[in-house]
Amino acid sequence: MSSQLALRGPELSANLCKPEEDTLRVLVTGGSGNVGVGVVRALNAARHHVVVASRGYSPALLPEGVRAVRLERTEPDAYTRLVAAEKPDAVIDLTCHDAADAAVTLRACAGVDRVVVVSSVTAAGPATTTPVTEATAAPPLSEYGIDKLAVEETVRAAWADGTSQALLVRLGAVYRLGADLDGQLAEDGCWLAHAAAGAPAVLADDGAARWNLLHADDAGAALAELLANDRARGVLVHLASRHPLPWRELYERVHHALGRPFNPVSVPAEWAAEQLEDAEFLAETSRWDQVFDLGLLDRLAPSYQERGGPSRVTEVALWLIRQGRVGDAELGAEIQELPARLAAVRTAPGLV
């Protein structure tokens, strides 16, 4: 059920008269994952010949005509052998998690004309000022962000020594039907259980920070256009939503769609980060506005138009609730206790 639902979305327009010389043989590593599903759909719709490489692929997620192969990139030279066997015109790598991965990708794809390495906006660290540009360089806080920055540094070194002109794409958070939706206080879907139960929504700093969610179909459409642009080489480009949504509005939309009252309770983000056992997501990402300068994306992918929006995010949230995919109950209980703990602190002797 979820496999089929995950493929639904706005129709991706295909150019049925696409010249043969514009058709590429594209290898997508990680093509069956959260982002990869949208990428593969878009490439297939654009009439490219797509091969998906993954460690544990899900054939049901792949459009008809897309071929799947196995890749365990930790095996010595496995990636290099796969590229040599498939002879792709282009590679989109969604599985570069650290510097070692990036080095393997660049070595394996040394003879490939077009290479796209997907990084993350977390590589830029907390977005204390917005819009965030490609030149923003605040130190990342999380291990994930630090590793993604190392990916970028490895690719930049290859630019500098002339061994690669891979395109670096700094991707924001991506959602789709069938994938989970994080809340503001934790990288987890427990906020959905609170909404379904009609419990108060616990937000940080009134939920005023704007969250940035890009639909996987939109991510795929943009990456497909970037891949087709011969000028999109040797640069770093942001790919994120043009319609960031305040956390408060996101929570309110879901509560109202469920017919539940919306009674938000706010706690200070800095204080909450000190209380939670795992506060990396709040400290690095969700307490800050996720607003990105997409000017370079506009220049490199001028025909790309984002189709997702708040209504589609709400649709995904409702689907997750119906499926019972509502996060970690213990974590949810910890978050629900925060307002009472804050009240106790504020009324303690000697505190105002």
Swiss-Prot record:
EC number: 1.1.1.355
Catalyzed chemical reaction(s): 2'-dehydrokanamycin A + NADPH + H(+) = kanamycin A + NADP(+)
One Pfam family here: Epimerase
Pathway the protein acts in: Antibiotic biosynthesis; kanamycin biosynthesis
UniProt keyword terms in alphabetical order: Antibiotic biosynthesis, NADP, Oxidoreductase
GO biological process, one term: kanamycin biosynthetic process
GO molecular function: aldehyde dehydrogenase (NAD+) activity; oxidoreductase activity, acting on the CH-OH group of donors, NAD or NADP as acceptor
Keyword presence, Hydrolase: no
GO CC term (a single one): cytoplasm
InterPro entries: Epimerase_deHydtase (IPR001509), NAD(P)-bd_dom_sf (IPR036291), NAD(P)-dependent_oxidoreduct (IPR051783)
PANTHER family (UniProt xref): NAD(P)-BINDING DOMAIN-CONTAINING PROTEIN-RELATED, PROTEIN YEEZ
Main function: Mediates the conversion of 2'-dehydrokanamycin A into kanamycin A.
Family the entry assigns: Belongs to the NAD(P)-dependent epimerase/dehydratase family.
Protein name: 2'-dehydrokanamycin reductase
